[in-house]
Swiss-Prot record:
The keyword Ion transport does not apply. Regulatory component of the Usp12-46 deubiquitylase complex. activates deubiquitination by increasing the catalytic turnover without increasing the affinity of deubiquitinating enzymes for the substrate. The complex deubiquitylates the wg/wingless-signaling receptor arr/arrow, which stabilizes the receptor and increases its concentration at the cell surface; this enhances the sensitivity of cells to wg/wingless-signal stimulation. It comes from Drosophila grimshawi. PANTHER family: WD REPEAT-CONTAINING PROTEIN 48. Keywords: Repeat, Ubl conjugation pathway, WD repeat. GO terms for molecular function: ubiquitin binding. It comes from the Eukaryota. WD repeats lie at residues 26-65, 71-110, 113-152, 164-203, 206-245, 248-287, 290-329, 349-388. The lineage of its organism: Eukaryota, Metazoa, Ecdysozoa, Arthropoda, Hexapoda. Residues 591-615 are annotated as: Disordered. This is WD repeat-containing protein 48 homolog. Catalytic component of the Usp12-46 deubiquitylase complex consisting of Usp12-46, Wdr20 and Uaf1; regulatory subunit that, together wtih Wdr20, stabilizes Usp12-46. The Usp12-46 deubiquitylase complex associates with arr/arrow; the interaction leads to deubiquitination and stabilization of arr/arrow. The keyword Repeat applies. SUPFAM superfamilies: WD40 repeat-like.
């Protein structure tokens, strides 16, 4: 017996997985942040599809993809390169901060200090210090050299915290020397700390909405802020006041980039415009470009002649800056004339994000429509893309493929990352509620006359964790074989599987194939909820769901004395032909087989062949079932009849009668 030890015992857990390709070379959703390594021209992009990608900006080829960095399972909100480009720090909506080997692309360690979405990072290059902040109102300071030295045995890290924030923090900035740190929040104010002492030095008021982006001057004397109120403000920290308010956007300002001399601002807005503005003379401005969607992030290209921009869409574009020569953004160039910008210098194409999803009635397939209006069918059970239908009419295809069958919901679909994430749990939707016949597209059993029922949730969990070996501390039972998987199918080995708290933090993320590893096996043993180990390790069978229903003669029956209304209970997936068999054998032959009329009678034992006596015709060709004045298809199961025909909260009621040329004696 597996003794399941878990620190998550009191937490309600869920399991999720992503249906995707083994390698996703394109962003599948918006891109939240950019970082360029000037040493090698590598551009790092933080995606809302939970993936950080690396691009070669020095190549003229359209194929700029180098690699993906995957370990987050929600939006990556911010990234910073540190240690001269050797390492990268990332912040995510999965509430974690991760430390990466930037060159090799693997996650070195995960920091779980935050309790909510981590929205922003700030980096002090001269001190190798990183700050993180998010919706939990907390700001933490990290020593990068300590973070990059963490190992499995040396995994203790200390952090300093900056307290005093009263609302969710959306922006954060530090100067290179690490003498000033500034935060912006939904409190609509800027808070300033000295990170060396963790003491708050001041707060600045002036914005009327959330402060979305911040930049601190290298000397720590000035701060530039962009807000959802549509303004850009320049603050003098020595004077503790706003010295300039710039109105160049019609909607919120979400991204800022400064010239080296801190005299020019490049701003990106929700209004889709990217604009260059001179701080001392805001009327001296020039539109760089109008993007196709709200601008999320900006970053210089390698020679600073252009600016990389990301938006709600998945493309990353580089736009030529409008300037006479590069000195206008470096030395000032007050007398230089603007030249027209807006030329697209390069584009890294992204993929389509799924925007709509419908779960079909069979509760196995889902149909999606993406941002390019392309329709795709996915097989949730096998965790694969089944069919690409192209840009066809979505609603018509859903209607065409939906069958009149009712199977309980056993999973939910999350489209936040732009890819289909399937969620299994035990809360509002029970992942073990879907019992179906083996005919649901799975291999036939050895005996075709045997009716086998399968549980979708059980089969899927067994496939997702097929490579999980129980801990060695469990004494093996030599009398029982080591059973792995579900015996019917396997799922793609590259599938990411995530264990997380319901509505909360991620506890464990791994690929299907990685569950065989010793460390992953131990982690699963510590974190997997009991309802998962019950079916995957203990091989327990989920309980059947039952439906009570009434059975009575149809008014057209020729024997009015048979007016008794029997109440029965059966598994909800029993087909109506079994009810016909019960009527034929247990009700109409009451004189010879006095077993009908029991109020607690179940159909579990009514499995005999209706052809064995009296006629070679099956029961459904001799008995007719009615519900709500509708003849019931004998292939329908009880839950489908209740959902599509009965449509009432009261117990399902059937009426039966003999078909033509058949009497009570079965002749």
């Amino acid at each position: 017996m597996l003794t399941h030890k878990t620190c998550q015992a009191r937490k309600k857990m869920q399991v999720s997985f992503v249906i995707r390709d083994a390698e996703e070379k394109q962003h599948r959703n918006g891109v939240n942040a950019l970082q360029l390594d000037p040493n090698n021209g590598k551009l790092y992009s933080a995606g809302r599809d939970a993936i950080i990608r690396v691009w070669n900006t020095r190549t003229e080829s359209n194929e700029k993809y180098i690699q993906s960095m995957e370990h987050h399972n929600d939006w990556v909100n911010d990234i910073v390169l540190c240690c001269n480009g050797r390492n990268l720090i990332s912040a995510s909506c999965d509430t974690t901060v991760k430390v990466w080997n930037a060159h090799k692309g693997f996650c070195m360690s995960t920091l779980r200090t935050h309790r909510d979405y981590v929205q922003a990072l700030a980096y002090a290059k001269d001190r190798e210090q990183v700050a993180s902040a998010g919706l939990d109102k907390a700001i933490f300071l990290w020593d990068v050299n300590t973070l990059t030295a963490l190992t499995a045995s040396n995994n203790t890290v200390t952090t300093s915290s900056l307290t005093g924030s009263k609302d969710s923090i959306y922006s954060l900035a530090m100067n290179p020397s690490g003498t000033v740190i500034v935060s912006g929040s939904t409190e609509n104010i800027l808070r300033i700390w000295d990170p060396r002492t963790c003491m708050r030095s001041m707060k600045l008021r002036g914005h009327t909405e959330n402060v979305r982006c911040l930049v601190v001057s290298p000397d720590g004397n000035q701060v530039v802020s962009g807000s959802s109120d549509g303004t850009i403000k320049v603050w003098n920290l020595g004077q503790q006041r706003c010295i300039q308010t710039i109105h160049v956007h019609k909607e919120g300002v979400w991204s800022l980039l400064m010239s080296e001399n801190f005299q020019y601002i490049i701003s990106g807005s929700r209004d889709r415009n990217i604009i260059v503005t001179e701080i001392r003379n805001p009327s001296n401005k020039m539109l760089v470009c109008e993007e196709k969607a709200p601008v999320l992030s900006l970053g210089y290209n390698i020679d600073k002649t252009g600016v990389w921009a990301t938006t709600w869409n998945s493309d990353i574009r580089c736009w030529k800056l409008p300037m006479y020569d590069r000195c206008i953004l470096t030395s000032g160039g007050m007398d230089a004339q603007w030249t027209l910008g807006g030329t697209e210098m390069a584009c890294i194409r992204g993929g389509a994000a799924i925007k709509e999803c419908t779960v079909l009635n069979d509760k196995r397939y889902i149909i999606t429509k993406d941002s390019q209006d392309k329709v795709v069918v996915y097989d949730v059970l096998r965790v694969i893309k089944k069919e690409e239908l192209g840009p066809i009419e979505y609603e018509k295809e859903v209607m065409k493929r939906n069958k009149q069958v009712y199977i309980p919901n056993w999973f939910t679909v999350d489209l936040k990352t732009g890819m289909p994430t399937i969620v299994l749990g035990q809360e509002e939707v029970d992942c073990f509620s879907a019992w179906v016949s083996i005919e649901a597209g799975l291999p036939e059993c050895d005996d075709p006359t045997t009716e086998i029922k399968i549980n979708y949730g059980k089969l899927l969990l067994e496939a997702l964790l097929e490579y999980w070996t129980p801990p060695h501390s469990i004494p093996p039972n030599e009398m029982e074989p080591d059973v792995r998987g579900n015996g019917y199918f396997q799922v793609p080995k590259h599938t990411p599987v995530i264990f997380s708290e319901v509505g909360g933090r991620t506890v464990c993320r791994l690929l299907v194939r990685d569950a065989a590893g010793d460390s992953e096996s131990t982690l699963l043993h510590e974190t997997a909820p009991q309802w998962v180990t019950d079916v995957v390790i203990e091989r327990n069978i989920p309980k059947f769901l039952k439906i009570p229903f009434f059975l009575q003669p149809h008014p057209q029956m020729t024997k009015p004395e048979r007016s008794k209304k029997d109440r029965l209970v059966a598994n909800e997936f029993i087909q109506c032909r079994k009810v016909c068999e019960h009527v034929l054998e247990k009700v109409l032959n009451t004189e010879t087989t006095p077993s009908g009329g029991n109020a607690n009678n179940s159909l579990q034992n009514s499995q005999s062949d209706a052809n064995s006596e009296g006629s070679q015709l099956p029961a459904e060709e001799r008995i007719e079932l009615w519900c709500n004045d509708v003849v019931v298809d004998p292939n329908m199961d009880l839950r489908t009849v209740r959902h599509f025909i009965w449509k009432q909260s009261t117990d399902l009621t059937f009426q039966y009668k003999a078909k033509q040329n058949f009497n009570f004696d079965g002749k």
